Amino acid sequence: MFVAKSIAADHKDLIHDVSYDFHGRRMATCSSDQSVKVWDKGDDGEWHCTASWKTHSGSVWRVTWAHPEFGQVLASCSFDRTAAVWEEIVGESNDKQRGQSHWIKRTTLVDSRTSVTDVKFAPKHMGLMLTTCSADGVVRIYEAPDVMNLSQWSLQHEISCKLACSCISWNPSSSRAHPPMIAVGGDDSNGAYSGKVQIHEYNENTRKYAKAETLMTVTDPVHDIAFAPNLGRSFHVLAIATKDVRIFKLLPLRRESANSSGPTKFEVQVMAQFDSHNSQVWRVSWNITSTLLASSGDDGCVRLWKANYMDNWKCTGILRGDGSPVNGSSGPSAALSAVGVPGAAQMIVGAATAGRKKAQLMPG
């Protein structure tokens, strides 16, 4: 059972992304008004805006939290061709009494020549690493060699994907059997490149990332992509938001010999495909146990998907943009562009039409 709670986000333009921190008690929103807002859940159960500041000179597409092991750190990316890293500084006590916190810019990453469309921190077992992707098809991986000095970031890898990148997702598996892996989605609408999703894997021998797989069946623009938490599986599960919702299974094929080099080859299977949104799907997000997938689309609804014991995926719930449950089909309402699931219990939705500048919260 989900109960809706509306948040007057007070953004002056469209909300593009909503992101929870690791514990699900802080969230960040970003908007075309060029700002980022940070929200904290109080003891009263209400969400309070504790910081709001202009971050970029263009629309802010994405915002994401680092693992709390590295402190209170955010990254954002923008149409202004940059990504930025922000750190919260403990301010004076009177600021805390007013419920405000200070965030300062630690660095600006300026390598991209086009809009930076997504930004993600790598899984914490890899250290403090940050990945960006750009509309010109380049994925960049940065590392902070000293986690105590977030003003210094070195560019470790540049991956040319040859497609207009729109979204990225790290494989969260920390198993030594799985090399670091990143999925990249593209949203160019031309048919020059048939496969709009690529899987790149780190090669220990060459110390570079190489393309391991292209999902050739994904031919429409991809808006979001998300690896499921691994939880000891021998295969990987990848959710994709395109003109519908798709869930893929990537099963690593056994290498011919232990000494064989080159990226892993995968057997790619479609686990599920849903066109229930009857429209473009903008966000997909897993819960922490990878048992529940949430998707949001232009039909103005969030849909929840769950697999039964036979591994058949079915819709287990539909929520409108205002948080009300849907019985049966629903007509279009405000288009939803952002959905995040920090755990099994919470979900956040950002409304993405000019008339929708609120964030909608559904705690379970």
From Swiss-Prot:
One Gene Ontology term of the molecular function aspect: structural molecule activity
Localisation per UniProt entry: Chromosome, Centromere, Kinetochore; Nucleus, Nuclear pore complex; Lysosome membrane
GO terms under cellular component: GATOR2 complex; kinetochore; lysosomal membrane; nuclear pore outer ring; Seh1-associated complex
Activity control, per UniProt: The GATOR2 complex is negatively regulated by the upstream amino acid sensors CASTOR1 and SESN2, which sequester the GATOR2 complex in absence of amino acids. In the presence of abundant amino acids, GATOR2 is released from CASTOR1 and SESN2 and activated.
Stored Pfam families: WD40 (PF00400)
WD repeat copies, ranges: 10-49, 55-96, 111-152, 160-210, 217-258, 276-315
UniProt function note: Component of the Nup107-160 subcomplex of the nuclear pore complex (NPC). The Nup107-160 subcomplex is required for the assembly of a functional NPC. The Nup107-160 subcomplex is also required for normal kinetochore microtubule attachment, mitotic progression and chromosome segregation. This subunit plays a role in recruitment of the Nup107-160 subcomplex to the kinetochore. As a component of the GATOR2 complex, functions as an activator of the amino acid-sensing branch of the mTORC1 signaling pathway. The GATOR2 complex indirectly activates mTORC1 through the inhibition of the GATOR1 subcomplex. GATOR2 probably acts as an E3 ubiquitin-protein ligase toward GATOR1. In the presence of abundant amino acids, the GATOR2 complex mediates ubiquitination of the NPRL2 core component of the GATOR1 complex, leading to GATOR1 inactivation. In the absence of amino acids, GATOR2 is inhibited, activating the GATOR1 complex.
Protein's name according to its UniProt entry: Nucleoporin SEH1
